[in-house]
């Protein structure tokens, strides 16, 4: 593994999205980035910040502007690559822990049998993590965030997934199983 932490970018760029009713959604995403960057600096952890937009596009520039509001004084780098190379999956696979808010990439990470941390600092009941316990944090406290992240990083994958006390393949099937299920359904129609 190349990285300790993969932070999933979740910029609040579209005022017409499903999270419009959550007034602190954007600030929650910003706070997650602040906490993650601070922790990585303090603990000398290797971070990859995975963007959802392509570099030098309008949305890519807006994504950087969004995080500049929260991380401006800190130097930060968002990896913005063409989706055709599946950069988010690559970075998740190369990381010990994936951190985010509501991104489907967190479920994808579970499907890849990778550790995740859902950060729901918004307090909104509209946002529900499919996981709880070690895999979720709700209190917007840097001290609690740091403690939880370091705890997860100290656990083996087996101990982490055993502590979830759920069948994580019910949250997201491994990619090979997803392909098999789709392939089997297509064959039924042939």
Where are these regions (language model features)?
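Catalytic binding pocket for nucleotide-activated donors in carbohydrate/polymer assembly enzymes
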Residues: 66-68, 72-73, 104-173
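Hydrophobic/aromatic beta-strand patches that form the interior of the parallel beta-sheet core
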Residues: 6, 48, 97-99, 117-119, ...
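C-terminal alpha-helical cap of glycosyltransferases
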Residues: 172-190
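Alpha-helical elements of Rossmann-like donor-binding domains used by nucleotide-donor carbohydrate transfer enzymes
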Residues: 34, 144, 148, 181-185
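Conserved catalytic-core segment of nucleotide-activated headgroup transferases in glycan assembly
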Residues: 1-67
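Donor nucleotide-activated moiety binding/catalytic core segment of transferases
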Residues: 52-112
């Amino acid at each position: 593994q190349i990285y300790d932490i993969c932070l999933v970018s979740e910029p609040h760029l579209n005022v017409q999205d499903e999270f419009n009713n959550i007034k602190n959604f954007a600030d929650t995403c910003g706070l997650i980035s602040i906490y993650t960057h601070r922790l990585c600096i303090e603990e000398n952890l290797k971070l990859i910040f995975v963007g959802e937009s392509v570099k030098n596009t309008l949305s890519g520039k807006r994504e950087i502007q969004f995080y500049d509001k929260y991380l401006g004084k800190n130097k930060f780098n968002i990896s913005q690559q063409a989706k055709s190379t599946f950069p988010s999956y690559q970075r998740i696979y190369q990381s010990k822990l994936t951190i985010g808010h509501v991104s489907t990439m967190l479920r994808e990470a579970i499907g890849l049998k990778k550790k995740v941390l859902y950060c729901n600092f918004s307090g909104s009941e509209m946002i529900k993590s499919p996981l709880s316990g070690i895999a979720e944090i709700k209190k917007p406290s840097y001290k609690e965030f740091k403690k939880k992240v370091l705890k997860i990083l100290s656990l083996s994958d087996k101990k982490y997934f055993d502590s979830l006390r759920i069948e994580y393949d019910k949250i997201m099937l491994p990619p090979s199983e997803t392909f098999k299920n789709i392939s089997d359904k297509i064959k039924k129609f042939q």
